[in-house]
């Protein structure tokens, strides 16, 4: 039998303190009935003697301290799961938002998931083709990896996220591929963009969307990625799917954490964020991966906007410690009209070596990748030198590198948001650009690959 309390002592922001409680547990789901009969929900955030601090999901407006009834439900926040969720749009708490029927769950699960035994993890080693050359060719995404996108305000990360969700696939595999898309604190226009893009291209049939809008309660943002990841775990480990989880915008998630932390009067950490921000982010990012003996996998692409384009800000800084690399969007490239504006030099995929090569992409992938990186870096240096000393001061080799850098940005990195390049097309495009440089400069590529791909039409 559920106990009902009418002992609300205090309400501060999204938090409510109830006293005189017994047998209440941490993270327990709470039902709050207002004097008007309206039902709201929350979860137990902290317990001290006979007091329980409750985090409210739908906000605290209109709560009367004397008349409000509180019921502790004896279970954590759960989400109903089913394969029928594919092709549907839900709000940030997992309720249908597309006008369709409620999901009849095959099972219900705690949104916090269960810790994965490190020994049970399988090492990521299979290539995922996103259709984006700057990622596939130079910062390869591997099945089971977590690879964030570091963006800035006003940069087209939403378009890139939609493009990856639309185009991503595992090559040479008959396994089903699904996308779980979690949006936190986005505007109505952004939400419409994602829904219309997925619907128009037909990719919504393999996608589950969770939408927490900017005018939804900030506290709901803390639950949204956990609900999305619980759904991904169900599809991956119970249904054997390869699941790509895209979470945007993690900055809004961290802001919601900061809001709750401030309401709890906790001692702030760097820039006002709670001291446990690193630990909290890890509970999301570490839910990516593969499990031995299970055919499915979870690959994560969290997207965050860096305040003031600052890579040292706590959110990108701590994210970089947990994840396996980063894809960085450049405002300079964006101003040049390079789309997507991926800055390949500071970007990194720490697991790229595991997902490329013979039988995965192509034998020449690693060598051409290293040569493209080296050529682009030297080309940028040559262009900087030309700005200071003038083009006449450049040697013929430097001019070739400067020409290569321009062509690399315009033809390789820039492809628009509707072009889906296969890995073969990406690698052949790399060889085409390398022909701009003298053969003597291609020191990072083995001779047999130069003979096979540079001197023949196979590399075109």
Swiss-Prot record:
Record's protein name: V-type ATP synthase beta chain
Keywords, in A-Z order: ATP synthesis, Hydrogen ion transport, Ion transport, Transport
Organism: Clostridium novyi (strain NT)
Keyword Metal-binding carried by entry: no
Pfam family, any one: ATP-synt_VA_C
One GO MF term attached to the UniProt entry: ATP binding
Signal peptide positions on this chain: none
GO BP term, pick one: proton motive force-driven plasma membrane ATP synthesis
Transport recorded as keyword: yes
Function (record text): Produces ATP from ADP in the presence of a proton gradient across the membrane. The V-type beta chain is a regulatory subunit.
């Amino acid at each position: 039998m559920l106990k009902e309390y009418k002992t609300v002592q205090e309400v501060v922001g999204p938090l409510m303190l109830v006293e005189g409680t017994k047998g209440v547990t941490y993270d327990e789901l709470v039902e709050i009935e207002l004097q008007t009969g309206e039902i709201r929900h929350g979860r137990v955030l902290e317990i001290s003697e006979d007091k329980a601090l409750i985090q409210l999901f739908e906000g605290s407006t209109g709560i009367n301290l004397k008349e409000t009834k509180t019921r502790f439900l004896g279970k954590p926040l759960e989400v109903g799961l089913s394969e029928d969720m594919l092709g549907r749009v839900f709000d940030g708490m997992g309720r249908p938002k597309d006008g369709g029927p409620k999901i009849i769950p095959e099972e219900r699960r705690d949104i916090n998931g269960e810790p994965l035994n490190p020994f049970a993890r399988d090492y990521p080693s299979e290539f995922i083709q996103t259709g984006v050359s700057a990622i596939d060719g130079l910062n390869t995404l591997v099945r089971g990896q977590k690879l964030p996108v570091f963006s800035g305000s006003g940069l087209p990360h939403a378009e890139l996220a939609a493009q990856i969700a639309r185009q991503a696939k595992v090559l040479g595999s008959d396994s089903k591929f699904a996308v779980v898309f979690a949006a936190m604190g986005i505007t109505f226009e952004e939400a419409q963009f994602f829904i219309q893009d997925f619907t128009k291209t037909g990719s919504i049939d393999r996608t589950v969307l969770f939408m927490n809008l900017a005018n939804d309660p900030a506290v709901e943002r803390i639950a949204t990625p956990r609900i999305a990841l619980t759904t991904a775990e169900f599809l991956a480990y119970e249904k054997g799917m390869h699941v790509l989880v895209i979470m945007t915008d993690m900055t809004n998630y961290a802001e919601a954490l900061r809001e709750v932390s401030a309401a709890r009067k906790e001692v702030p950490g760097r820039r006002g964020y709670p001291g446990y921000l690193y630990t909290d982010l890890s509970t999301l990012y570490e839910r990516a991966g593969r499990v031995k003996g299970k055919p499915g996998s979870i690959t994560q692409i969290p997207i965050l906007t860096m305040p003031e384009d600052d890579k040292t800000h706590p959110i990108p800084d701590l994210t970089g410690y947990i994840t396996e690399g980063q894809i960085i969007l450049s405002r300079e490239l964006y101003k040049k009209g390079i789309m997507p504006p991926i800055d390949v030099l500071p970007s990194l995929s720490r697991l790229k070596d595991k997902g490329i090569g013979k039988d995965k992409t192509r034998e020449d992938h690693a060598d051409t990748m290293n040569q493209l990186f080296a050529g682009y870096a030297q080309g940028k240096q040559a262009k900087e030198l030309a700005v200071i000393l003038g083009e006449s001061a450049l040697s013929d080799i430097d001019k070739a590198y400067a020409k290569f850098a321009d062509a690399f940005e315009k033809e390789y990195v820039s492809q628009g948001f509707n072009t889906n390049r296969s890995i073969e097309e990406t690698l052949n495009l790399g060889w085409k650009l390398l022909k701009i440089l003298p053969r003597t400069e291609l020191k990072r590529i083995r001779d047999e690959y130069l003979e096979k791909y540079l001197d023949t039409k196979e590399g075109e």
